Amino acid sequence: VNARLAELTQKADCPFATAMVENGDYIVSKTMGAFSLVVLPKPGQDVKAVQTAMEELERAAQFGLTGTEIQRAKEEIYSAAEAAYNNRNKQQNSYYVPKYVRNFLENMPACDIETEFNLYKMLQQQLPAESFSATLKEFVASTDSNFVFLAMYPDKEGISVPTTDDFKAAVKAAKEAKLEAYVDNVKQEPLVPVLPKKGKIKKEEESLFGYKCWTLKNGARVFYRQTDFNESEVNVKAFSWGGSNKLADKDIANSKLFNMVFQSTGLGNFNATELQKKLAGKQASVNASLSAYSEGLSGSSTPKDLRTLFELIYLRFQTPANDPDAYNSLMTALRTTLANQEKVPETAFRDSIFATLYDHNARQTNLHVADLDKVNYDELRRIYSERFNAAGDFDFVFTGNFNVDTLRSYVEQYIAPLKAVKKRESITDLNIRPAKGIINNRFVRAMETPKATIARFYMGETPYSLKTAAVANALGQILTQRYLQSIREEGGLAYSVGAAASVSHDLRDEYAVQVFCPVKPAQMDSALLLMDQGINDIAEKGVTAEEIEKVVKYELKTFADNQKENAYWEGNITNYIRWNNNDVEGYEE
């Protein structure tokens, strides 16, 4: 049912931004269950949204669910359960804690993964397809005797709230509507209809951190490392210099929407809805992204779905699918979301931070409703084709549980045949720098509940080394602890305060120290004085041996834990490839 509702949202004229059903507690009650439909209407379409969502629920109850829908749902649940089962011996605390909480609060069985997986396999085989439709029909109320309707709105002037009779009429109209059975349109063709001729690996060599590197004939480089940290995980990351810095100023708005658009639209010959159905039961995804300096891909799969991962990589380097329905649906939803965000004082605060730090540079601003009027789907597709024109300009990183021979075969089949480049693009520096000098920006906005937020930034250039990076990291942690003591515990000025410090090495060697603290407006100046005092004390007197000991203990524990994380090694090899950084060797010393 949720898949049907999500499919409706891909249409630009859908009156709701999102809608979903769930079977669980009745609101906050732990002693009464309920089958619920939750609807988030688009502005001014509240009644229509309720009627449309209810009609879809009634359609499913009247005509039942199709066999292909049920099969896809089974495959989705099974593939997720299988991935958890395959990695059952390497679960972290975050997996176990919620289980025991539910066991204590709700008397839910705290089963191990193996038991859950075996139960699911048994139930999946025993439940006939018609039982799902029968259960749904029981869930959907046929009379008003067991039906509750709740509508919640902000208590603000100017908000138009439909009447109870309006909503009753919408529900009545949905129940009395003459509906037709849902048609499950499924595209049967392969993701990649015609396989390209295999390409070749030109060179093999060792790299850092246990990675090896294949240089392909088309110019692409593939770094790979086999691990057994997670039995069900293979990660991929790819990147090429270029990014939004290569775009003209007229494309700034397009660049801000790039990531969202191409994560929401289809691939190859499949629109977004068709692709979602095609990938049912597959634990594989690949997203494209555009940043200031580069464009890239990021994705993951299970070992079982590695071929699908490579098919998606291959499709990401083809002409992007023309999916105007998904694009228009996204734009409509964004107008609602951004309009609501712009009413919130915190949005103005975030905007002011960027405007202050980067002197109102248009490339360093957040997305606003006004930007949407400057975005053009055809231009976005043009930008995509330019930025992802040739895989030969990219470096790929694969980390996880895979067979090297299988990986080699897929690299030769899906990456090596892609377009080559004679010369790789170089990084483009637009000379966007933080504003210099001491700048104070204090502004006031009307708020129902008055509050203030302090954001402080200390930024500049300093030579990078592994030691300075470690020292900066320690500074942020120690500042946080000192501010918690002086501002929260002793001063009683705030519930929370946090600091972070870093030294980066990319185009320039820079440092940044940031402090955030929400306070009552009348106590803001007092908090600022304590902030100054805290950082000045460290500058003049240094830190204590006890503070250093705590940081070192925490960092060494984190470092040891990270040795078994695919994402940690992926991040470090990526940092090395892009910036020639080695933040692993010598870190403990």
Task: Pin down the residues of each PLM region.
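Conserved short beta-strand edge segments in small beta-sheet-based binding/regulatory domains
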Residues: 323-329, 421-425, 543
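Proteolytic maturation boundary segments
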Residues: 1-2, 6, 71-75, 79-82, ...
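Short Ser/Thr-interspersed hydrophobic loop/turn segments at strand-loop and sheet-helix junctions
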Residues: 479-483
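Peptidyl-prolyl cis-trans isomerase
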Residues: 126-131, 135, 322, 327, ...
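M16 family metallopeptidases and their MPP-like homologs
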Residues: 5-62, 68-126, 145-154, 223-225, ...
